[in-house]
Amino acid sequence: EDFRTWLMGWHLEQYGKVLRRSIVEEVVQNACAIAQYVNKQTYKLGVRVSRVDDGSANPKELYYDLGDAVVHITRDGWEIVDDPPIVFKRYSHQEKQVRPDATSRKADIELLHKFVNIQSRNDWLLFLTFVISAFIPDFPKPLLLLTNSNGGGKTTIMKLTKQLVDPSVLDGIGKIYNCESIVRPASKHALLYFDNISYINQDISDTLCGVATGTSLVNRKMYTDLDD
């Protein structure tokens, strides 16, 4: 549908005329056929974070989508690139990320501590592990469970973490009705959080674990049931 809209907009801009729907459908069908049976070139599709699939368990190159450019990350450093080998899917809810400043002083992840209300050193290290893991694609993720009294800053911590990893105009999910209400949004976010959830059943628990670890069943649901 995005391609159809782009095609109609491009034709209107170039020729000042609106394409008939029948012509649009013919172009789309021809493009799909060429892509599948002639070109046959495939691209890895990422959502906010991705990697070049070199078959290794420890990726040597990571890519992070800023929304209008991409950060290429290696063990030697990072750079902003405009034409990465990764194709990122950008959803309407996503916001552009702040561009990192290569001229700033050496970053210190401990500076994040002054923005979050985590007192225990052990809890703080667990939180940092969660944040760092969110930037590693195709990797089993831990599930972060925040507990505190009312007004203890749980929602604030998750909103900050969401904006740090995967900025979005959407807030966290307040209700989980079924497994589908997890799988669908999880396929459109690099980081997803649930707010004020008091109970989950076994099926939902299993689905959450599947999303975190990337099981094949959950992945199949993501890519076959993605249309809203």
What does each model-identified segment do?
Residues G77-K188:
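P-loop NTPase catalytic core of nucleic-acid-dependent motor ATPases
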Residues D2-N122:
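Segments of Walker-type
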Residues G172-S181, I197, T215-D228:
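Conserved Walker
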Residues E1, K114, T224-D228:
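Short, intrinsically disordered, charge-balanced linker/junction segments flanking boundaries
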Residues L191-A212:
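Conserved AAA+/SF3 P-loop NTPase catalytic/coupling segment centered on the Walker-B
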Residues D2, S22, E26, N122, ...:
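Charged, alpha-helix-enriched surfaces in structured cytosolic catalytic cores
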